Amino acid sequence: LCNPLNGNFEKYINDKTILVSCMYVNNETGLILPVEKLAGLIESSGAPALLHIDAVQALGKLPVNVCSLGCDMLTVSAHKINGPKGIGALYVRRGVRVSPLTYGGEQENSLVPGTYNSPACAGFAAALHELGDKDAQHLKNLYGHFVTRAREFDFIHVNIFGEHAPHIINITFDGYLGENVLHYLEEFGIYTSQGSACSSHSKKKSRALAALGADKRTADCSLRISFDFDNTVAEIDEFFKVCAQIPQNLIRCYK
């Protein structure tokens, strides 16, 4: 795991590098990675590496154009745009050969045994069809309102590490353990997360925050907030109404 924003990306690729895989949008911080720049660096290095982009968190929130991104492969998932769970899509640039991970059938271009889940595929297509510019703008409006409200509290800090997607916010409740705040918010029907779902059972410091230079205190006291297309400004106001009571109800673990 490396931070491609720190200027040292080139030292990780050489003539033995066959694949570079990166997120378009980090799922803990909302940070947008400069994937077009990474594609250029790989090409100029002369390395034989293919570039794979995990665009799961970008779909529906940012433009996803495989030509302008310069990728060889790209993956997205339906559930992030209110489509069915368990179905995704893999883009493979013409000329790139992909070998199957499992064998047993040739009917689906010899990539997977069995048959694709046609109803889920249709559901994914329908969800894509329903996406519009107004959805992305709505998320931007929610993000702006959230950041404005957060400035009203001296113990709440929005962690912005660079260019940012509009639907994921990483915030620090200074002095209060993120896990304690998470469970406190749950009592009011407000559900957040500490880190990504992929590492929800890990007690270690977030690798994403560490790579971006966050110290242990910041990582311990941070939560991830994410918005859906159906969230409202009123719900954000309710969130901060509950947060205002944190100093009266929780013990500070850092001074």
Regions inferred by a protein language model and the residue ranges of each:
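Pyridoxal 5′-phosphate
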Residues: 1-255
